[in-house]
UniProtKB/Swiss-Prot annotation:
This is Glutamyl-tRNA reductase. NADP(+) binds at residues 189-194. It catalyses: (S)-4-amino-5-oxopentanoate + tRNA(Glu) + NADP(+) = L-glutamyl-tRNA(Glu) + NADPH + H(+). It comes from the Bacteria. The record marks 99 as: Important for activity. The gene is hemA. Homodimer. GO terms for biological process: protoporphyrinogen IX biosynthetic process from glutamate. The active site is at 50 (nucleophile). The lineage of its organism: Bacteria, Pseudomonadati, Aquificota, Aquificia, Aquificales. GO terms for molecular function: glutamyl-tRNA reductase activity; NADP binding.
Amino acid sequence: MEIFAVGLNYKTAPVDVREKLAISEDQLSGLLKKISEINSIYEVSILSTCNRVEIYGVTDDPDDAFNRIVQILSSYSGLQKNELEKYLFKLTGREAIKHIFKVSASLDSMVIGEPQIVCQFKDAFTKAREEKTVRHILTRLFDKALNVSKKIRTSTGISKRAVSISYAAVELAKKIFGDLSDKNVLLLGAGEMAELAARHLSSSGVKHIFVSNRTFEKAVQLAEEFGGSAIRFDKLFEFLPESDIVIVSTGAKEPILRKEHFEEINRIRKGDPVFIIDISVPRNVAEDVNDVDNVYLYNIDDLKVVVDKNLEERKLAALSAEMMLDEEVHKFEHWLNQLKVAPLITKIRNYADEIREYQLEKLFNQMPYLNEKERENIDLAVRAIINKLLHRPTMYIKDKASKENKDFYVDILDEMFSSKWDLRKLKEKEKKKNVKKD
């Protein structure tokens, strides 16, 4: 049995190709079922996000599994098989295990350390479990991958450093104010940057979010999404004095907020600090606003310095994480290899037990005067001898399970305990001997 990974992601395929393979929630069940019905596939799970569509599974024939999956994905996406294959990666064994671990730990993400992938990874496993397309091996693989992810995040702090402008803005606000639960926020602008900032602020538990935009409908839409209030653009200055944090992200060509505005606001707020983040290009807040007492202005370049520094720190953390990940991949691979030889070990022990039972039956028939206790003691002694004799071969098999040439040793031992050595042959030989004696 081999673990495999096949699919595409932001590294291998452009967004227009990824879009064609995007799998919606209501399509996922059918696709899981279809792939799980492939004879060479024993377990399967699908991870589908905006940046990747990847299929993880267990197979006894990787080539057949890959070929069948590509056919299914080709039919699903409408892309020709040979066109689709240009964008696909195909991994087996250790490489597949390592890739899956890296994905769950966010080491393969577009933004290293981003936390969303953990939830997406869990959801992929939960869905596969609901559809009964995962069993023992993938269950352990996902459990270990999530444990590794948690261990890496805890020990390296890889997710703690802001690496987006919007997130950095919120982290900066936390440094200035500490607790944000009693702070009002005003978003000036309702574009993508403002939306990202609103998302981070909302998850940080701010008191209230006001949204103002020249197009009022956009302000209403964004405010409703985060339980805030929409403000008409011409009413902006009525709400500025109530705002502790102001995030500006508009397309204006010149400053909207000026020094004189905040001098008046400072008087109304009686010295309570105001934190302003201008992530507009060109800047929408006049630079001399920073000269007003209790007003703290940061622009996109200030935040970029923070982001660049944090990106470098994340890269260093990622190097440390890679070392931890390699160790865990080795452990899982060792477990999987031992699992592969488990049937052989069971076969050898079953063979020994059959011999034990047969020989004891013969012995007890020849010695009918033995009582139950004596028979039990003899049986225990024979079992102990068998366990002693089989201990070293068992350890030998487990040790060889992780070697590159393990199949050579496994085949030899499997042949030794194959049907030509089985108990039926032994019984037949003894029956012939008895016939000759008679």
